Every structure is written in structure tokens, then in C-alpha cells.
Amino acid sequence: MIATPSQTGPLILGGTGRLGRALRKLAQDGHWPEGRAALWHGRRGDYAWDMREPAPPLHERPEGVVVLAGVTSGSPEELAANADLARAALRLAARDDLGPVLLMSSAAVYGRAEGPCRETEASPANAYGMAKLDMERAVAEEVDRLGAEAPRACCLRLANVAGCDQLFDAMAARQVTLDRFTEGHGPRRAYVGPLSLARVVSALLSAPELPPVLNLAQPGAVPMEALLEAAGARWHWRPAPETALPETLLDTAQLAAIAGPVATATAPGLVAEARLAGWRLA
């Protein structure tokens, strides 16, 4: 598909990955109007582009760029592609005078930090978190290099997305073993539902000013056992190892100041949003 003159949505790079598929279903089902008007990238998508190569022409002007494209696992060399993909997106935006550019980073940049984690902090504890922090730095360097031609760019430190993370994958496969800490609870994590994510992205695309880095989560930390119960999943406990992380919590004050109030995360709400975006319990 070639964008039409009525194209008013963003260009979404990496639209065929897990998160992209969830957001596209929301768009196709009418839950995310801006996504329905978007130009969806993929090697065989609306906008076909191998991001390792120069970007082909855009026939219409999209309203901003959302970069979902990324590498989540592999060797440090493979994970370094996250920075390369970010640079490619920024160069396309600079070439065609597009913006803002929203790039998906990760709460993994906070590692084992105790929350609420703020955007001024970063202490990655694994290769993926380090790769995402390197990507953020690469974005800042590329913006400086591009100078006056640089687009506005914001790296979003994304929480777990309901329906797209390891817990929901394990639920779908009916293979869930949950760590239980000595206090009797399981891990608590920062989450965002896919519909809430889509709405926040739309708000950020229209924001007049954006910081270089921004946390993206619904307020609060959700007990994983509550998610399992809300989904009707089968699971069992195991004693939490010493290396297990009890809680990840993101500070969302800056997000609320820019995008407006975001509903506090609840297990039933997250499961409902995951199902709306196509997730199913096997």
C-alpha cells in the first residue's frame, strides 16, 4: 500500500514484530484511530524498507515516526543493532523533515535499581539493558551530528507491555512458575497495556516539547500473581532465588505532565487490554 493524500498517522518502523502486531490489531479493530491511518513499515509492509539499507522515498508525509524496530536477544554484537536501527530512523526523519521520532528503549536500562526509577538514572544489569542504553546515547550523538536538520527525538523507557512480555507468553503456553519471596508475594512489575500505550504514543506525537528520555508505564507496580489470576492461568510457586528482583517501578510524573493523566495499572485492566490486542490464553 502507498500512503494516500489522507495519510495523517505516523510512520511505524518495525510494525511486524510482536508489539507492532498488537498495536496494528488495535488499529484495525478501530481502537486506535491514529494507528489506522498510520504507514506500517516492514520488509513487505505498507512501507517496505530493509533498515540496513538507504531508506526509499516516502510518497506522503506521515505525522511523526514511531520506532518499534529492535533486537531483544542475542550476542552483544547482535544487540548493538538497536543503535544502528535508531540512527537509520533518525536519518530518514532528517531527510524528509519528519518528527517527532519516538524510539522504544526499555526499563531494562534501570537494571536492579529500586524504584521509583527516574529518567536521570540508568544502571543496566544485563546485555539487553546495556544495548538499550547504548541506543539512547547513539540517538543523542546522532541528533548532535545532524545539527539543525535533526528531528525532535525521544527515547521511551518502556515498561512490560501486557500481552507482549515473557509472563504473557508463558501463560499462553501454560508453563508458569512464579518466584515467591519470603514476604509471601511474587514479583511486582511496571506495566502498560497496549491500548494505553497506543494512546500515550498519540499524545506524545502531538506534544510541543519532548525530553530526550521518558519513562512510559502506567502508574504503579502490578503483582504478577494478580495478572495470572485475572487471566485464569495455571501456575505454581517456587522459592525466589537470591538473584530475583522483587519490584520494578517507574516514576511517571514527567509522562503525566506531557501526555496527561494515565490510569493506574491493574491486573484486570492489563489482561483486558492484552486480549483486545490479540493475546489469548491457550
What is each residue range found by the language model?
Residues 88-127:
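Conserved Rossmann-fold NAD(P)-dependent oxidoreductase catalytic core, especially the SDR/UDP-sugar
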Residues 142-190:
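NAD(P)-dependent short-chain dehydrogenase/reductase
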Residues 2-32:
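N-terminal Rossmann NAD(P)H-binding glycine-rich loop of SDR-like oxidoreductase domains
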Residues 172-181, 188-214:
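Alpha-helical substrate-binding/gating segment
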Residues 46-88:
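NAD(P)H-binding glycine-rich loop region in Rossmannoid oxidoreductase-like domains
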